[in-house]
Amino acid sequence: MINKYIYLVFILLIYSVIAEGQNTVCFDIEPNPNSSDPAFSEFTKYINVFGIGIYAEDGVSNEKVKHVAAIFAEWLDNNEDSIVDNSLVLNELLSRGALMPVFEDEGSPAEISFFENYDGDGVSAVCYEFEIITYRPLVNEFDATIEENLHTISSLGYANAYPSAFSEEENSNSLLTLAMDLARGGHFTSIPNPYPPEAWYHYDDYTCDYEC
């Protein structure tokens, strides 16, 4: 019986070390390098991830800013060897000035200033403070950081590096869009109500367009 308890304690210790290692973030928050640009003037926090800027306003905690940066980095460097796994994707992101804005809330000063003044092509998604979950999500929770970072990387990176496979344009006939149309039971530019019986993928976010 004692041996079983020792074994259990050992397993729990190993698990705690692994969990702690997965949550370790090695990024430092820097001052906003583009504070003189009207579009970025309300951001006070910045992290450089392989040349891609993570910009956050003051109301977003340092922990959450670092979490967004860590997830972005892991999408690009999954084995965490500090080398981007796909240089073509990174080059497409950099050529478009890809970035990830992190706003405290919808309609915040930073969001208003950003979208009133930004005229680039580097934004495909944004993060909001209330959507970011830095701990292990519960059953009814989802860390939107994962999805929003992937939107940016897929839309600006993969879709341009490999258009025949990953283009998100509705008439591109890419492998991605053909697979999605098959899963949804047809080609729909708006959400069908209801989905056809043969559909096995039912996406119902009315804030999204076909590409989303």
Q: Where would I find each of the regions flagged by the language model?
A:
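Boundary at the C-terminal end of the N-terminal hydrophobic targeting segment
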Residues: 19-21
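Catalytic-loop region of hydrolases
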Residues: 28-39, 62
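Extracellular low-complexity, Gly/Ser/Thr-rich intrinsically disordered linkers
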Residues: 199-212
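Sec-dependent N-terminal signal peptides
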Residues: 5-15
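A eukaryotic "domain-start" boundary segment
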Residues: 23-26, 30-32, 45
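Acidic/His-rich structured neighborhood in mature extracellular/periplasmic domains
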Residues: 42, 49-198
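N-terminal secretory signal peptides that target proteins for export/translocation
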Residues: 1-3
